[in-house]
Amino acid sequence: MVRQGIDRRYLSSIILLQESAKTAQKAQDMKQLVFERINSGGVKLEPQETRNALYNGPMNELCANLARNKYLCALFRIPNEESYSLLDDEQELPDVAERVEKELENNSLYRTMYDVELVLRFFAIRNLEGYQNQFSDFLDKYLIYANKFSSETLKKLSSLFSDTIFFAYQLLGENAFFLWRYRRTKSGSKWGWFTRSTTTVYDPLMFVLSEFLDQKECLLSTVKAIREDLKPFYQKNYDVFEGRNSNRSDIEKRITLYREFFKKYLED
């Protein structure tokens, strides 16, 4: 069943067919056919909207629930009652719930279920060896596979995501997934922060931070130095981070660079 309690684009809801298929495979084939026809005309569904209806299951539901994590929402500027207090200490409006509801309607990450995909990406990249062709296909296959995980495994993965996104917020602040980039403009060229979170940073950084959870306190004790060193880190390795390339090789290179970057603070 499509994620309950969440009013996303109406196409994600009308796919709830009263199927008469005799087998699970037949039901899946029918869903796939419906989506192919819908996507060939009218409003085209985004990848995660399609996954949400075609491949719903325990892992998909977990991703949907974790997408409302207050730290993820704060870092990607997705409206959330709890995350408002992280971004604005003065946010104590009595109508905050109503405000969040209205803002969610206009938030593209939420409306297209990209927030749910962000969580799925975190889990899938832990199995990067399965990424062979298109990234979207990789996510599809991982979700199908992960929907079969035991409840105990899902519980552990849930804690891993929650602990890692909190660590990212603690260590690098609300702009943890911003990229320090080089820009050429008519008035000249300069370095500056790309002022929104990007998966170019999110994907490899979250992977590496999850590896360092056991050394979390040591890294947090050097938070000032780490934040100051990020700019020269990105400048030195900009050829690896520029652009939107996200093939397996790109992600692996970024993971290696982040891993080496954080290791030096544990060796001092």
PLM regions: where:
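Basic- and aromatic-enriched surface patches that contact anionic nucleotides/nucleic acids
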Residues: 1-130, 140, 235, 239-246
